[in-house]
């Protein structure tokens, strides 16, 4: 029976989607032959090349949560739980005997147990830095990252300006959001308004207390 790897891209970003990728294989030798590794350790060109090889040789899926989806869900649950349910949605698209996941929670055991409850047919192995240890998780990381990068390219084209990487550490991203809020009085589409830096910008603009989130 197949097994799978699951990983995400965009968890900490302030702009753009959160993407969970899953790759399903009977044997991960083909992924090892491709040379997969954690997507963060690859250049964009290497990721694109490996992405094409992965999706051409293995079953795969992605689950996407937009910025608005994340804001809505964050009113009811933690980001870890948002990711938990997305992981489960990805795993449950196939019948698998085992699922390897890059654990977003500090508690690997608790996250494994929760994911196992949502994916009762699969043995769950959730580890920190699983994308370094399991080729199938590395492949899932690449699928998630390339999918998100392409979606962010579409967002850049939509706005027609440099929006950066979408992460709060990127001054292009934060300058774009700050200027948009200054001019329009609200955050641009594709921005996570539940993120603290954006809340602060909106509060400063409206001169109100942070009571909505």
Feature roles, as predicted:
Residues 1-213:
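RNase H-like, Mg2+-dependent phosphodiesterase core
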């Amino acid at each position: 029976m197949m097994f799978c790897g699951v990983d995400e891209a965009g968890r900490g970003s302030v702009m753009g989607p959160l993407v969970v990728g899953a790759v399903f294989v009977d044997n991960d030798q083909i992924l090892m032959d491709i040379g997969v590794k954690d997507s963060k350790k690859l250049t964009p060109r290497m990721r694109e090349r490996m992405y094409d090889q992965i999706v051409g040789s293995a079953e795969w899926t992605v689950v996407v949560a937009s910025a608005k989806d994340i804001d809505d869900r964050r009113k009811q649950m933690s980001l870890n739980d948002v990711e938990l349910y997305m992981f489960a949605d990805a795993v449950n698209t196939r019948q698998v005997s085992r699922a390897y996941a890059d654990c977003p929670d500090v508690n690997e055991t608790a996250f494994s147990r929760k994911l196992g409850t949502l994916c009762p047919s699969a043995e769950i192995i959730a580890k920190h830095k699983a994308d370094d240890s399991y080729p199938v998780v590395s492949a899932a990381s690449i699928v998630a990252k390339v999918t998100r990068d392409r979606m962010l390219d579409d967002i850049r084209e939509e706005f027609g300006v440099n929006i950066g990487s979408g992460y709060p550490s990127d001054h292009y991203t934060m300058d774009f959001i700050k200027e948009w809020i200054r001019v329009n009085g609200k955050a641009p589409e594709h921005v996570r308004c539940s993120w603290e830096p954006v809340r602060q910008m909106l509060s400063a603009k409206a001169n109100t207390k942070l009571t909505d989130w």
